[in-house]
């Protein structure tokens, strides 16, 4: 399953992507109107693989039956969390895959951009790399992808760590998401910052400041800026990186709609009778609106064997409290998950009833 003992192995599918999209959008296309994104039901997500720096089994080849997949949030990327995932790989003695979801980082730009499609990309990734059963860590958008994947494909997941999100529609976060993406579009339309400007980052930050006063949030967004077109790993078909201006790695103009409506949504009817019986750890940022007291009913309904760990932070908890969230993740996979499994196994009647209910539901679904 794992071919190397190197601590960090970058294996993005860049050559294939470049061949598929070797002709970026021209200036004329950009100026004449919004070039449509291609439609793809499944993409090969770009990824990095982080292996433990020290193995408890000495010089023997390291092997783990349960690798971890780390799914980032909206406007995030695998690069943002490479140091965190290296620490997790070593602390947990297991391989950690960090991926770029579609329209982010080094992965392809394509529609649809909704949770069902992102789950399909994740399932494809697991099968493509022959990972078997995995654990998932999901943050924000990635948290909802992880929850939905566990509910729809429980056979592929052992445990999940869900960071500051809940399995429910969240219309109250649409304003936040809209501001986040619109600030990027405003920077492109009004900032017109050149790539050869030595003060490009300062000027971009000042442009965003009107909409994003928090410096930490601005830095999170600025991590997506392309200021050197010669090192762009993925040449988007809808972005002209050769016009002398800075650009985002994301097709932000195309995400104005789906990046708000679909990201705040949740397929309630599709999963209303489903449960995931594996252990799930919810990390709740206490200064965030993504998990509120009303969310607990949905969490307990879908994930009966859960633990909720609170951290005093905003929704950007990974940036604000990196050591605290890492400790919470490590403690969950080392200790709490087994406590939740024991709790589940001590109530075999309830466990078997739930299993039979899920099995019958799946059988009915297949017959329709």
Swiss-Prot record:
Major place of residence: mitochondrion
Any one of the GO CC terms: mitochondrion
Matching Pfam families: Abhydrolase_1
Keywords: Hydrolase, Mitochondrion, Transferase, Transit peptide
Gene3D superfamilies per the UniProt record, alphabetical: alpha/beta hydrolase (3.40.50.1820)
Biased composition (Polar residues): 348-368
Record-linked SUPFAM superfamilies: alpha/beta-Hydrolases (SSF53474)
The EC number(s) this enzyme carries: 2.3.1.268, 3.1.2.1, 3.1.1.-
MF GO annotations: acetyl-CoA hydrolase activity; carboxylic ester hydrolase activity; transferase activity
Catalyzed reactions per annotation: ethanol + acetyl-CoA = ethyl acetate + CoA; acetyl-CoA + H2O = acetate + CoA + H(+); ethyl acetate + H2O = ethanol + acetate + H(+)
Domain AB hydrolase-1: 67-171
Positions in coiled-coil regions: none
Annotated active site: 140, 164, 315
Transit peptide feature range: 1-21
Start and end residues of each stretch annotated as Disordered: 344-368
Cellular compartment(s): Mitochondrion
Phenotype upon loss of function: Reduces ethyl acetate production by at least 80%.
Entry's family note: Belongs to the AB hydrolase superfamily.
Function: Alcohol acetyltransferase that catalyzes the synthesis of ethyl acetate from ethanol and acetyl-CoA. Can also function as a thioesterase by hydrolyzing acetyl-CoA in the absence of ethanol, as well as esterase hydrolyzing ethyl acetate.
Record-given protein name: Ethanol acetyltransferase 1
Organism: Kluyveromyces lactis (strain ATCC 8585 / CBS 2359 / DSM 70799 / NBRC 1267 / NRRL Y-1140 / WM37) (Yeast)
